[in-house]
Amino acid sequence: MAVGKNKRLSKGKKGLKKRVVDPFTRKEWFDIKAPTTFENRAVGKTLINKSTGLKNAADGLKGRVIEVNLADLQGSEDHAYRKVKLRVDEVQGKNLLTNFHGIDFTSDKLRSLVRKWQSLVEANVTVKTADDYYLRVFAIAFTKRQPNQVKKTTYAQSSKLREIRKKMMEIMQREVSNSTLAQLTQKLIPEVIGREIEKSTQTIFPLQNVHIRKVKLLKQPKFDLGNLMSLHGEGASEEKGKKVSSGFKDVVLESV
């Protein structure tokens, strides 16, 4: 008779348990700081495994993208329908210095805008900012009832929609190409470009709910620590940034 190993009889001693190691003992927390473009700079915290040997924690944090609600950054629920993406570019002690990486609408807001009896106009353009960031900017708009209109629907003709789309692309191209990334962020928060499109297309067809619904970063220039530090001010640990006014105006330099 062949003799084999009886698994039932070869169990270890009763009462001995495997030692459980808390995984958080090997991790450390870092504070995420938003640029001074936003009113509240303290975004939150993130964690990563501690530096061991040749493996540096800072290398794993650089390039990490964090999504934050704009209402938290501005301290106002009026901006709750927009999400901002921030990218970690530099690690200073326990602070992570971030830069703007994109903006988007929440899905519930986007769905609430689409209704019956009106035309939807969408346009997008790929453009380079004044400081060499390549962005793809998406705009959305809807037709609205004209004064004293009796007709139920507000559909626009295809020729009118083409004119509106062309005007939207022209305005987006102009506004983005003449601004740095920080200046563009200041325009996006109070919806300056959307209001400009709405005003410029009044002669073609009246519009409503005109928004820059999404900005996507395609390519960024070579990393410059000086530019990043200027975005975060001299004190990178400050909790408050600059308040963006709702009536943003471009600074016009007088000719010398």
Curated annotation (Swiss-Prot):
Main location: cytoplasm
Pfam families assigned to the protein according to its UniProt record, in alphabetical order: Ribosomal_S3Ae (PF01015)
Domain of life: Eukaryota
UniProt keyword ATP-binding, yes or no: no
Positions bearing N-acetylalanine: A2
GO cellular component entries: cytosolic small ribosomal subunit
Entry keywords, A to Z: Acetylation, Cytoplasm, Ribonucleoprotein, Ribosomal protein
GO molecular function, one term: structural constituent of ribosome
Compartments where located: Cytoplasm
Gene Ontology terms describing biological process: translation
Self-association state and partner proteins as the record states: Component of the small ribosomal subunit. Mature ribosomes consist of a small (40S) and a large (60S) subunit. The 40S subunit contains about 33 different proteins and 1 molecule of RNA (18S). The 60S subunit contains about 49 different proteins and 3 molecules of RNA (25S, 5.8S and 5S).
Membership in a protein family: Belongs to the eukaryotic ribosomal protein eS1 family.
Official protein name in the record: Small ribosomal subunit protein eS1
Organism in which the protein naturally occurs: Meyerozyma guilliermondii (strain ATCC 6260 / CBS 566 / DSM 6381 / JCM 1539 / NBRC 10279 / NRRL Y-324) (Yeast)
